């Protein structure tokens, strides 16, 4: 049973499809991209990979010690997540904790490898960019800076 403010047939800002189709649109698989990356790079270059699904942005802090994972160049939040936030009135700190907000896959690599990983992704028509960095810290934490504020976890 659906009880949100937006009807499933309502149009969604900046999208040619209605809310129902937006919610039901398929998720892209990253398997071909990851396969190509792993055929070229090993654990010396790839320090970690996180699929942002279940635990979303905060999941990464399970895998670091004495590090601040700083995400300050995220992709724009897609209309679906804006719609969820507007209808639920969930604060953005919780949105980034619960939903990926359009940010789906993270690969932790040295800066000199990053551009090649981006080019591999783009060869599969998948947008990619450097979204942040990891810095030494006295504790483990995640800092997200977005158009909706700065959030620490």
Language model segments and positions:
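Helix-biased detector of long, well-ordered alpha-helical tracts
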Residues: 1-153
């Amino acid at each position: 049973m659906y009880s949100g403010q937006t009807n499933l047939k309502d149009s969604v800002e900046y999208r040619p499809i209605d809310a129902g189709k937006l919610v039901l649109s398929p998720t892209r698989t990253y398997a071909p991209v990851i396969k190509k990356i792993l055929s070229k790079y090993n654990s010396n270059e790839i320090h970690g990979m996180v699929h942002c699904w279940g635990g979303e942005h905060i999941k990464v802090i399970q895998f670091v010690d004495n590090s601040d994972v700083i995400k300050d160049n995220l992709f724009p939040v897609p209309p679906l997540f804006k719609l969820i936030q507007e209808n639920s009135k969930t604060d953005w700190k919780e949105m980034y904790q619960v939903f990926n907000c359009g940010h789906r896959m993270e690969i932790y690599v040295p800066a000199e490898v990053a551009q090649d990983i981006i080019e591999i992704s783009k060869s599969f028509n998948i947008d990619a960019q450097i979204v942040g960095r990891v810095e030494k810290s006295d504790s483990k934490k995640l800092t997200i800076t977005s158009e909706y504020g700065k959030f620490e976890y």
